């Protein structure tokens, strides 16, 4: 339970029972924060990871009344809840907009009304689309599907709430996140999780296309640390001229590997399936900005982790 005297910072995490959110909750607790966890368990994950040392709220981020009640005395908000995978968003673009645009605006408004110190928004590298790589934050958006378009719209709402209302926001564009608790089946499973499940079941790894697609993989523990540093770093605001609040920061490894390389590191029992529309060929982050302004660098390499 949350102490009424609140001797520690209080953070609210949406999507807190999922893959990235639950790892972030663990990290915040390690840093001495109290945590309010919000999740509606709609992601069709293998498992949900509610933490017994937090105050847990089962609710939808589009429900303003329920969300507003969860914001009492909150210092920091980490907004991860989303329609977060490509194929579900392509099949149901209205649902993606409701969750990723309306839900994000509800959270921003609740944060504004509660007077939180800073709001950290989890976004996606897919907003870069077919821009030249490595992707840098100054590139224009090139959204190829409803998922990336709706997440990029959420970024614009964050910037607007900073400029218009003075709410401190930071946008983190994740590249391909991997690590413990990654989903291994269903629409929300990333490629490494799918490959690991297939290997454990004695099945061939299903490689989309020819496996030449390149991905920038970043470990979930590095992502959790990036969130914490983005929320607490004083480096983002010095004065009205040197102000980086409301801006986008890449969270990636700064390197990339082909899907074929990842598959080979897991199992040589492989098969190939047709390419899917709306997917990018390469994700590759330039992480100069987040290193310079927040002091974050990744620590875990995907091929080392897979050994």
Predicted regions and their residues:
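Residue-level signature of the cytosolic catalytic core of signaling kinases
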Residues: 50, 59, 184-188, 244, ...
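N-terminal Rossmann-like NAD(P)+-binding domain of SDR-like oxidoreductases, especially those catalyzing
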Residues: 1-177, 221, 231, 296
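Gly/Ser/Thr-rich beta-alpha loop segments that engage phosphate groups in nucleotides
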Residues: 17-20, 61, 105, 131, ...
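NAD(P)-dependent short-chain dehydrogenase/reductase
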Residues: 133, 156-215, 220-232, 264-267
């Amino acid at each position: 339970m949350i102490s009424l005297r609140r001797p520690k910072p209080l953070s609210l995490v949406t999507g807190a029972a999922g893959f990235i959110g639950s790892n972030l909750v663990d990290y915040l607790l390690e840093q001495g924060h109290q945590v309010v966890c919000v999740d509606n368990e709609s992601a069709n994950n293998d498992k949900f990871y509610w933490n017994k040392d937090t105050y847990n709220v089962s609710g939808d981020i589009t429900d303003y009344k329920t969300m507003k009640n969860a914001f009492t005395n909150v210092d920091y908000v980490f907004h991860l809840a989303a329609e977060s995978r490509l194929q579900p968003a392509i099949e149901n673009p209205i649902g993606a907009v409701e969750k990723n645009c309306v839900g994000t605006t509800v959270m921003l408004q609740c944060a504004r009304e509660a007077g939180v110190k800073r709001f950290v928004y989890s976004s996606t590298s897919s907003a870069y689309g077919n821009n030249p790589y490595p992707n840098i934050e100054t590139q224009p958006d090139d959204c190829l599907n409803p998922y990336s378009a709706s997440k990029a719209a959420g970024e614009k709402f964050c910037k607007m709430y900073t400029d218009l209302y003075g709410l401190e926001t930071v946008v983190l564009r994740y590249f391909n996140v991997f690590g413990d608790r990654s989903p291994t089946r269903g629409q929300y499973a990333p490629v490494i999780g799918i490959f690991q499940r297939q290997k454990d079941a004695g099945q061939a790894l299903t490689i989309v296309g020819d496996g030449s697609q390149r991905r920038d993989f970043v470990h979930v523990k590095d992502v959790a640390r990036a969130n914490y540093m983005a929320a607490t770093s004083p480096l983002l605001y010095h004065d009205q001229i040197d102000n980086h609040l409301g801006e986008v920061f890449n969270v990636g490894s700064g390197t990339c590997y082909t899907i074929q390389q990842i598959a080979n590191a897991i199992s040589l029992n492989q098969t190939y399936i047709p390419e899917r529309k709306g997917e990018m060929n390469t994700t590759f982050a330039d992480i100069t900005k987040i290193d310079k302004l927040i002091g974050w660098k990744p620590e875990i390499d995907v091929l080392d982790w897979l050994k």
